[in-house]
Amino acid sequence: IDEATQAIEPECLLPFLHGAKQVILVGDHRQLGPVITCRETKAAGLDKSLFERLVCMGIRPVRLQVQYRMHPELTVFPSNTFYEGTLQNGVTISDRQFEGDFPWPNKAKPMFFFNLLGAEEISASGTSFLNRTEAAQVEKIVNALLKSGVKATDLGIITPYKGQRAYIVNYLAKNGQLNPEIYKAIEVASVDGFQGREKEVIIFSAVRSNDKV
């Protein structure tokens, strides 16, 4: 079962109903878990995947410790925060060298945080959030990346909220400085919708913040 850590337990148990004698669970319980919106379901413990429950019971999973996606400098945070510093790099800095002329604050570390004063608001659906100021800044960063040589198909925008996703798509189409057809090639997705995939450059639109880091 692939992406088993995103599935609730009853979903993972379905193969047993068809006579399966062995089941291999593939996933990462340190990443995105099942998306549960019902309080009663969470209270019943169904917000935990079968994979994570088995790990908590003492069953040790086989961990793949070499990553081939990220620039080595980007590995440091997830390795130290989620994997006890055990992640290893299967790629070198030269393998992931950014060739464009984008003005990184530190070219040796191809990432940065952009602090904004805009506040979130409830989306038109009433069930999600959006941040207009943040969406406008995303458009500016997108334009800078495209002008520096990044292909639209190599660029992804991820946000935790469907309201923000819809707003960004609409904002790029109506307010983008470049040809609207270019923006259509940029994938804008929710966190769970993008799980397990990759792009050369990712912009993360957080929408909201709190006092915790």
Predicted feature locations:
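Conserved helicase motor core of SF1/SF2 NTP-dependent helicases
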Residues: 1-213
